[in-house]
Amino acid sequence: MTPKQVERIKNKITKIKRELSADKKRWGGYYDDSRGLRYLPPELYLKISDYSGALRYYNWFDKNFPDDCGFPIFLFEWTITLFKTKRIKQAEKKAMETFYSNTYLIDKFLNKEFLDFDKSENSNWEYSSLAEQLIYSKDQNELIDFADWLENFIKTEKFYAFANKFIGIESVLKTEPIGEKRTKLVKEKYKM
């Protein structure tokens, strides 16, 4: 990437931050951001390999949008950022959140066959088609170290236990009628 391209990306980030600041002023100290601008900067930071900038942005996001769980690709970018800034325990947790939000993204990144199991996909964020929008791959030079770490992490007992529990709950929820058992399963899923 040329210095001019890096400068353009930095200018985009600045413009988005300005628009978010104006949005907060417009709404009397609160954000509306119905355009979803808050989700754009991480991809831009990652394009220029500014992982500390991305981390600062995620800290800001967490503080200003505490009830926003993000969307799967955003969470995946957060996982990359945490890994690249040597926050491995947090990266593990975020990788599991990514899997929870979309079971296909990690497989897509690692060029693996999609995990196929019978589950209900209640949100368009959960569909396999979302994974096709992932612009990151284990083959990208700047992500080789992350890919190695992620490949190893998804083979750990910690990840297996999490994934198996999640898949088990999802499989039962697909056919479980409304009632006490379903309510208990939903609560258990949201505690994960």
Show where each model-derived region lies:
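Generic helix N-cap/helix-start motif at coil->alpha-helix transitions
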Residues: 1-3, 30-39, 69-75
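Helix-turn-helix repeat elements of alpha-solenoid scaffolds
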Residues: 5-20, 45-58
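Conserved positions within tetratricopeptide repeat
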Residues: 10, 55-56, 92-96, 163
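Solenoid-like repeat scaffolds
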Residues: 21-32, 59-69, 96-105
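TPR repeat positional signature
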Residues: 38, 75, 82, 113-114
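Residue-level signature for tetratricopeptide repeat
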Residues: 43-45, 81-82
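TPR/TPR-like (Sel1-like) alpha-helical repeat modules
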Residues: 82-106, 132-136
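Long, ordered, amphipathic alpha-helical scaffolds
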Residues: 105-192
